[in-house]
Design a protein with these regions (language model features):
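Membrane-interfacial, low-structure loops and terminal tails that flank and connect transmembrane helices
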Residues: 1-17, 153-175, 309-337
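Membrane-interfacial segments
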Residues: 90, 155-156, 246-247, 308-311, ...
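Interfacial loop-to-transmembrane junctions
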Residues: 126, 163, 167-168, 251-254, ...
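Hydrophobic cores of alpha-helical transmembrane segments in multi-pass integral membrane proteins
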Residues: 17-48, 61-90, 95-117, 131-152, ...
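Juxtamembrane "helix-exit" motif on the non-cytosolic side of transmembrane helices
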Residues: 114-124, 271-280, 362
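Perimembrane loop-to-helix junctions flanking transmembrane segments
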Residues: 46-61, 205-217, 364-373
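Membrane-interface helix-boundary motifs at transmembrane edges
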Residues: 88-96, 164-172, 246-252, 329-334
Length: 381
């Protein structure tokens, strides 16, 4: 096989290669789109990009472009999570190959056709290909849910397993992966329901632009619920995958898995409930968030001491000093950084978002709309 053939085989058949390809596409897209940002516009870079690439940007269509851009960014992210799941959770090999192939074709089609439709003229063919790409990603999710079915006795755990399981042997971590997958499919369908009405009375909106609109339409509420739950489920999936990386097990694992399952289900119900039960939906979402946050906290409680212990054992140190323990904790920046990010992100993003939602009328609605909009956009990003 030629050198190019070997590289292509690596990029499109191995987990590392597939992830690298998705990250590269996302990075190139981010680099391109950053030239259209506010600061770049002030320096004249935006106009250069538009002229050189022949972009067709109409200000009245900005919201639609942003929606397509968000989806073009998130499809590779979803694909990366799928790759990690098929590589780290036991499923049949042929299922893994089929799922990875489908989601790869889907996200690549969605990204390039979506950006083409949004920024380079509104070709109906590109719009159709965008929908085909999204549909393929959705179909890959359906296959993943089937492959992850946790009540398949082939994947039951023994009674003495250190991993969370029921008395009958059902692997609760596998249940958590399956629940998140099914919830993601349902939440994607919620967004698709709103998207299906484009051109039939539904106009594109950005959630941050209608936060103080006293009466929101059913489809606008569906968009708000869709964007919140999709981000939340991506976060929970990342937590579950980190648990696999750290070989999360034992007492804290048995506590965390039920909480993550309950949190995922509760948050999903709450976000879907925004459509019909707006007055109580936030309370349901808060409850689910607390369960999920507790599960993530237990991973940190397990992971940090495990990092210290593993490195001290490698260095054959029995009675470590405080400095040696800190060195052991920080020695692997990737693993420490992943755990630290859980703490940092929750204090600076999740808790801030919940606090804002609880105090909307009391505090934040007294602020100028511009300030509230900035806070919301920062929280979501």
């Amino acid at each position: 096989m030629s050198a190019i053939g070997q590289r292509l085989k690596y990029l499109f058949t191995s987990t590392n290669g597939l992830v690298l390809t998705a990250v590269a596409i996302t990075g190139l897209l981010a680099a391109l789109m950053s030239t259209l940002s506010g600061p770049m516009a002030e320096w004249g870079v935006r106009e250069i990009t538009i002229k050189v690439l022949g972009m067709k940007l109409v200000e009245a269509e900005r919201e639609g472009r942003v929606v397509l851009l968000y989806h073009s960014f998130f499809m590779p992210v979803v694909a990366i999570l799928v790759y990690f799941i098929t590589a780290n959770v036991s499923i049949k090999e042929n299922w893994g190959i089929f799922i990875n192939s489908t989601v790869t074709v889907g996200y690549i089609t969605a990204v390039f056709s979506g950006i083409g439709f949004a920024y380079f003229g509104h070709s109906p063919a590109l719009h159709g290909l965008m929908l085909v790409g999204l549909s393929l990603v959705f179909f890959a999710g359906v296959m993943l849910a089937v492959a992850l079915w946790p009540w398949n006795k082939e994947y039951y755990l023994s009674s003495d397993s250190p991993y969370a399981h029921t008395r009958g042997g059902v692997d609760l971590e596998r249940v958590a992966f399956w629940v998140v997958t099914v919830a993601t499919l349902g939440s994607a369908a919620l967004g698709a329901w709103a998207g299906a009405y484009y051109g039939s009375g539904f106009e594109t909106v950005l959630a941050e632009d209608i936060v103080r609109q006293p009466i929101k339409t059913t489809l606008e509420l569906a968009v708000i619920g869709h964007l919140h739950i999709m981000l939340s489920l991506i976060g929970i999936t990342a937590i579950l995958l980190l648990g696999r990386w750290f070989d999360f097990q034992g007492f804290w694992h048995r506590l965390a898995m039920p909480l993550l399952i309950i949190g995922s289900i509760t948050m999903t119900i709450g976000c879907w409930g925004v459509v019909s039960f707006q007055s109580i939906a936030h309370i349901i979402i808060y409850t689910g968030s607390l369960f999920a946050l507790a599960g993530a906290l237990f991973l940190v409680i397990f992971g940090m001491p495990a990092l210290v212990k593993d490195h001290l054992n490698q260095w054959k140190i029995n009675n470590a000093t405080a400095g040696q323990k800190i060195k052991a904790l920080l020695y692997d920046p990737l693993k420490f950084g992943a755990l630290w990010q859980i703490i940092f992100m929750n204090f600076t993003t999740t808790f801030v978002g919940i606090f804002m939602a609880i105090n909307l009328d009391k505090i934040f609605r007294a602020w100028p709309l511009r300030e509230e909009r900035i806070e919301l956009a920062g929280h979501w990003h």
